[in-house]
Every structure is written in structure tokens, then in C-alpha cells.
Curated annotation (Swiss-Prot):
The lineage of its organism: Bacteria, Bacillati, Mycoplasmatota, Mycoplasmoidales, Mycoplasmoidaceae. Keywords: Cell membrane, Endonuclease, Hydrolase, Membrane, Nuclease, RNA-binding, Transmembrane, Transmembrane helix. It is an enzyme of class 3 (hydrolase). Its EC number is 3.1.-.-. Residues 158-218 form the KH domain. It is found in: Cell membrane. Coiled coil: none annotated. One of its GO terms (molecular function) is RNA endonuclease activity. PANTHER family: BIS(5'-NUCLEOSYL)-TETRAPHOSPHATASE, SYMMETRICAL, SLR1885 PROTEIN. One of its GO terms (cellular component) is plasma membrane. PROSITE patterns: HD. This is Ribonuclease Y. GO terms for biological process: mRNA catabolic process. Residues 285-378 form the HD domain.
Length: 473
């Protein structure tokens, strides 16, 4: 009986085993299979997961790189600390055998390594303070120099007046039908202004050399009271010859007495003398050059460079203006030509060329001349732009006329409103005279500098015949 019960129990257990266990196994395997084969339902979701995975991998790589950099930085710092410790140890070990100077040097090197950044910052600060101090010092030098040389300003004009006490002389100056006046204007290249209401005679021209010669001639005519055509022509001829001697003496006096130079060739004296009769922007060139030379000399002494060289370079910087209006060169090119003609020093060449930025200053004197030239020209009222513009137009008009064959001379008078052209009667016939006037008119109208100005052109052709008779004693 007991065996039967046991058998029944075993049978029940066997049935349960063969029915339940397979079911459990199937369920388990299905669940396992679902986990292993799970994929997103859509392709877009799958791509997002892949991209997210890549992003996470990149972030992980960046973190690893930063971690490596930090490790390297820490390693470098540790090496520097070890080096400092070692240097300290070596310094302490060697301190007993070092002299005071050696110990000082070792300590300085040690501190320099340790405080390298702080030293760089301190250097930058000191440099900034030094530059500010330099700028203030330079300003003080310029202000002090200008205060010491502040001179009364004289601006040259194109009109010179001569007093006439005897009113009867005015009639003689004008002459019958205005002949004396016309000859004076033609010979002198000036505009003669005779006002019946005023006790003066005015001589007007932007060319200071012509004005000076005409002034001397007029003064001699007034003093002698002997005024006729022949005497006017003779005096102009004489004064032109004397003028070259006069400018030589002026130049010599300026060089030796005013400037104190005794090592210049005498040939350059005439050019220096002509500076007295040349203006630029209404400013007299000789006065300007002397002023600039004095500026340069004073500043040179303050900054410890050769004051004589500075003075020479500054004085000659505008020497070209004595001939630029007689040639096609600008005043820098003309100045360099004069300087080389008389073998002046190289630093003077550089000062002439660089003061208007033709070249870069290659000497301290060239740089100094640029500064002092600006100082002199920048003084309030020192220059008058309209004057120089007027002079440029006059020069251009006269230059155009002189290019034509048969023209003896050309002068601008009547304050720039009239161009008087004197022709050679042997070269220009009466028929050619009108054609010449037309050609001059066209040339003026084609010039951009002169297009906005109305100018009257007067051509003068005069033929004189002089016959001497036998003197009967």
C-alpha cells in the first residue's frame, strides 16, 4: 500500500515535470530572444541613437585629451618645482664657497626664473612711463625753443609804394600819352600804379626780384627828376647788372655775419642772397630759413647732437626756391642740384630731399629739419596760401608765353588780369602777331591751372630806329 502511494506521487510529479517545465522554458527563451533581437521600430530613431553614440564617444575622447593635457601641465609644474628645489639646494650647498658678487648674481637669476611674469609686467609699465616722459620732454624742448625765438612776423606782399613829394613828377612818370609808364612796365615786368589823389607811386608784381629792381630804378628817377624813355631803359639795364653783385654781398653777409659759417664756397653766396627776394606762401624764404636754422641749432644743443650741422642742414633746406621759378624743377630737385653743384655734405642732401617726404630721413639732421620746418611754417599767420597760389598762376602764364618763338619777355600785371607779351620785331611780322596771340590764348585755356581765370592778353611789337648825326664843331 505504501509503495502504491509513493508510485502515484512520483507519477504526478513526472507529469507535472513534463508539462510545466517545457512551457516555462519556452516562455524564458522567448523573452531572451526579444531582448537580444530588439531594434527600434523606425530607421530615424535608429540613426539618432547611432549619432548620439558617436557624440558620446567624441565627448569621451575630448575629456581624455583634456585629462592628458592637465596631467602634462601638472607634470611640467612638478618638473619646475623640482628644478627650483634643486637650484635652491645647489645654491645653499654652494653658498659657502661663493663671493658676495657671485651670490648676488645667483640669487638674481633664481628670482628672475621664479618671477618671470611679474618682471615682464613691470618692464611694460616702466617702458610706458618712459615713453610718456620722453614725449613730455620733447614737448618742453619745442615750447622752450619757440618761446626763445618768437620774432615779429613779416609777411611779404606783391605791392611796394614809393612816396612822391613833388606832384609834378607824377606827370613825368606817366609821360606823354603814357609812354614813360608803358616803357617802365615793359622793361621792369611790373605794374606801375600812379594815383593822382595819393602822394605815392605803387610797384606791383609777385616776383620780388623784379619788384626790387623796379623800386631802385623808380627811386633814382624820382631823385634825379630826369625821366624819359632812354633813361628808364638805361637804368633798368644798369640795375640788373648791379643786382647780381648785390645778392652776392647779401649772401656773404648772411653766411659770415649772421650764421657764422666760414667753410662754404663763395659761389653759393649769390643763391643765398637771392633768398631775400623770394617768398613762399607770403613768407620770405631768407627769414624762414634763418628762423629754421636757429630752431635746429637750439634743439640740437638740447639733445646733444652737432649744432653746426643741424644749423647748416636747416638753413639750406629751401635753397632750391631761389631758382625753382626759373626752371621746370620743383624746389626740392632744384635745391639738391645747387647743393651738389657746390659739394655740400651728404646730410644736407638728405635734409633737402626729406623735408617734403621725397625720401625718408636717414640722419638725425634730416629728421630734425622736418620738425623745425613744420614749426616755422605752422606759426599762426606765417603763411598765406592765396599769395602762393597767385604766384604759381603768374609763373605758369609767363612760362607758357616764353615757349613761343619770337617772344622776348612776358609779364603779368594788373593784379593778374593782364598778360603783357613783348615780341621781337625782327622775328615776328605783323601778320604773325595775331596768330601768335591766338596760339597763346589756346595754350592758356588748355592749362588746368588757369581755366577759371579771365586774362587779357596784350601783345607789344615795337621797332625803334636810332640815327646819329655828324656833330659840326
Amino acid at each position: 500500500m505504501g509503495y502504491l502511494i509513493a508510485f502515484i506521487i512520483l507519477l504526478i510529479l513526472f507529469v507535472l515535470l513534463i508539462t510545466i517545465v517545457p512551457v516555462v522554458m519556452v516562455v524564458y527563451l522567448k523573452k531572451k530572444q526579444l531582448k537580444l533581437t530588439f531594434v527600434p521600430k523606425s530607421q530615424t530613431s535608429f540613426k539618432k541613437i547611432v549619432q548620439k553614440t558617436k557624440d558620446l564617444e567624441e565627448e569621451c575622447e575630448d575629456l581624455n585629451n583634456k585629462n592628458n593635457e592637465l596631467k602634462k601641465a601638472i607634470s611640467d609644474q612638478n618638473l619646475q618645482i623640482d628644478l627650483l628645489k634643486k637650484n635652491n639646494e645647489n645654491f645653499l650647498l654652494n653658498a659657502t664657497s661663493l663671493t658676495a658678487e657671485q651670490a648676488k648674481k645667483e640669487l638674481f637669476n633664481l628670482l628672475k626664473i621664479k618671477f618671470k611674469k611679474e618682471l615682464a609686467q613691470e618692464y611694460a609699465k616702466i617702458k610706458h612711463e618712459f615713453n610718456e616722459a620722453q614725449e613730455i620732454y620733447a614737448q618742453n624742448i619745442l615750447v622752450e625753443t619757440m618761446e626763445q625765438i618768437a620774432e615779429p612776423l613779416i609777411v611779404e606782399r606783391s605791392l611796394f609804394n614809393i612816396d612822391i613829394i613833388d606832384e609834378n613828377l607824377k606827370g613825368k612818370i606817366i609821360g606823354r600819352d603814357g609812354r614813360n609808364k608803358a616803357v617802365f612796365e615793359n622793361e621792369g615786368g611790373v605794374d606801375l600804379i600812379v594815383d593822382r589823389q595819393q602822394p605815392i607811386v605803387g610797384i606791383s608784381t609777385p616776383n620780388p626780384i623784379r619788384r626790387e629792381i623796379a623800386r631802385i630804378v623808380m627811386q633814382k628817377l624820382i631823385d634825379s627828376k630826369n625821366i624819359d624813355i632812354n633813361r628808364i631803359e638805361l637804368l633798368f639795364k644798369e640795375e640788373r647788372e648791379k643786382f647780381e653783385k648785390k645778392v652776392f654781398e647779401i649772401g656773404k653777409n648772411v653766411v659770415e655775419q649772421t650764421l657764422g659759417f666760414f667753410d662754404l664756397p663763395e659761389g653759393i653766396y649769390s643763391y643765398i642772397g637771392r633768398m631775400k627776394f623770394r617768398n613762399s606762401y607770403g613768407q620770405n624764404i631768407l627769414s624762414h630759413s634763418l628762423e629754421v636754422a636757429e630752431y635746429a641749432e637750439r634743439i640740437a644743443k638740447l639733445i646733444n647732437i652737432d649744432p653746426i650741422k643741424a644749423k647748416k642742414a636747416a638753413f639750406f633746406h629751401d635753397i632750391g626756391k631761389t631758382i625753382d621759378f626759373e626752371s621746370d624743377l620743383d624746389h626740392v630737385e632744384a635745391g639738391l642740384l645747387i647743393a651738389k653743384k657746390f659739394n655740400l655734405d651728404d646730410y644736407i642732401y638728405n635734409a633737402i630731399e626729406s623735408h617734403h617726404n621725397k625720401v625718408i630721413p636717414t640722419t638725425i639732421y634730416g629728421a630734425l629739419v622736418k620738425i623745425v620746418d613744420t614749426l616755422s611754417a605752422a606759426r599762426p599767420g606765417a603763411r598765406v596760401n592765396s599769395y602762393d597760389e597767385y604766384y604759381s598762376r603768374v609763373k605758369e602764364l609767363e612760362t607758357i608765353c616764353m615757349r613761343f618763338e619770337g617772344v622776348k619777355s612776358a609779364y603779368v600785371i594788373k593784379s593778374g588780369r593782364q598778360l603783357r607779351v613783348i615780341v621781337d620785331s625782327n622775328l615776328v611780322s605783323d601778320e604773325q602777331l595775331e596768330l601768335l596771340g591766338h596760339e597763346i590764348k589756346v595754350a592758356i585755356e588748355e592749362n588746368d591751372l588757369l581755366t577759371n581765370y579771365k586774362i587779357k592778353i596784350v601783345l607789344i611789337k615795337e621797332k625803334r630806329i636810332s640815327i646819329d648825326t655828324n656833330i659840326i664843331g
